[in-house]
Regions:
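Short helix-to-coil transition segments within interhelical loops
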Residues: 145-151, 155-175
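Transmembrane alpha-helices
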Residues: 127, 131, 163-197, 240
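Periplasmic/extracellular loop-to-transmembrane helix junction in inner-membrane transport proteins
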Residues: 6, 30-72
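Transmembrane-helix boundary motif in ABC transporter permease subunits
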Residues: 69-99
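C-terminal transmembrane helix and the adjacent membrane-cytosol boundary/short C-terminal tail
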Residues: 89, 146, 181-184, 223-253
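Non-cytoplasmic
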Residues: 182-231, 241
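Generic hydrophobic transmembrane alpha-helix motif, especially the helices
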Residues: 100-136, 143-144
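Transmembrane alpha-helical segments of polytopic membrane transport and secretion proteins
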Residues: 1-19, 238-253
C-alpha cells in the first residue's frame, strides 16, 4: 500500500497534465479547430488501435528483435572504447578528434552507404542503430572516467587494486552515473533511428507501421501506432530507471 501511495504522490501532477492534454485535444478536434485528416478525434484513434490490436504485439517484437541486439552491440563498443580513451591520455589525445569528427555525422546521412555496403537490409538497419547508440554513451564514459574523484583512486592504491580488478571494482562504478546518463540519451535517440531503419528492411515493426500508414494518409492508424510507440518508450524508460536506481543505490538521491 505504501508503494501505491508513493507512486500516486510522485505522479499525480503528471496524471493531471495528461488528462488535461487529452481533454484539450478532444475539445479542439470535436470543435473542428484542427485538420480532421491530420488530427483525427480520440474515438477514431481508439477504433484504429483496436482494429490493429493483434498487430501491435507483432510490431513490438519485430522492433525489439532489431533494437535490442543493436543497442547491446553499440553499448559494448562504446564502453570498450570509452574506457580505453578515459584511462589513457595518449590514446584519448590521439583519437578523440577523429571520434568527434565521425560522431557529428547523423546516422540517417550514412544510410545510402549502409544500404550499398551491408550484406542485407537488416544488417544495414542494425548498423545505423549501432552507430547512433555509440556516441552519447562513449563520450559519457570518457567524461565519467576523467572526472572520477581522486579519493577513489587513492583508496584503490591503498587496497593494492590494479589492472582489471581496479577497473571493475573502482573505475567503472565511480563513472557509472555518467555512463548511464549517456546511455539514456542513446536509448531515446535509438527509437528515432529505429523508425528510419525499419523503412528499409521491415515487414513489421512499430516504426514501419507508423511510416507505412503515414505514406498512405491513414492518419487514424498513424496516430494509433505513434501513441503505441510512445507507450513502449515510456515503459522501457521506467524499467531502465529501476535498473539505474539499483545500480546507483550507493549514491545520494
Amino acid at each position: 500500500m505504501s508503494h501505491v501511495k508513493a507512486f500516486v504522490k510522485k505522479y499525480w501532477i503528471t496524471a493531471v497534465l495528461i488528462v488535461a492534454i487529452c481533454g484539450g485535444y478532444w475539445g479542439v478536434t470535436h470543435a473542428g479547430l484542427l485538420d480532421s485528416v491530420l488530427f483525427p478525434t480520440p474515438e477514431r484513434i481508439w477504433k484504429a488501435f483496436m482494429t490493429y490490436a493483434d498487430t501491435m504485439p507483432l510490431n513490438f517484437t519485430s522492433s525489439m528483435a532489431l533494437l535490442i541486439p543493436s543497442l547491446a552491440l553499440g553499448t559494448v563498443i562504446a564502453l570498450a572504447l570509452g574506457v580505453l580513451m578515459g584511462m589513457n591520455r595518449r590514446v584519448r589525445d590521439t583519437i578523440y578528434p577523429i571520434v568527434y569528427a565521425i560522431s557529428v555525422v547523423p546516422a540517417i546521412l550514412l544510410s545510402p552507404f549502409a544500404l550499398h555496403l551491408a550484406p542485407s537490409f537488416t544488417a544495414a538497419s542494425m548498423f545505423l542503430i549501432v552507430y547512433n547508440t555509440i556516441w552519447a554513451t562513449l563520450f559519457a564514459t570518457v567524461t565519467g572516467i576523467m572526472t572520477i574523484d581522486k579519493r577513489y583512486l587513492d583508496n584503490a592504491a591503498t587496497l593494492c587494486l590494479s589492472g582489471p580488478r581496479k577497473l571493475v571494482k573502482v573505475i567503472v562504478p565511480a563513472a557509472m552515473p555518467s555512463i548511464l546518463s549517456g546511455f539514456v540519451t542513446s536509448l531515446r535517440s535509438s527509437f528515432l533511428v529505429l523508425v528510419f531503419a525499419e523503412m528499409y528492411s521491415a515487414q513489421y515493426g512499430m516504426g514501419y507501421f507508423v511510416k507505412k500508414n503515414a505514406d498512405f494518409g491513414l492518419y487514424d492508424n498513424t496516430w494509433a501506432g505513434f501513441l503505441f510507440m510512445i507507450l513502449v518508450l515510456v515503459v522501457v524508460m521506467q524499467i531502465f530507471e529501476k535498473i539505474k536506481n539499483h545500480l546507483l543505490r550507493w549514491t545520494m538521491d
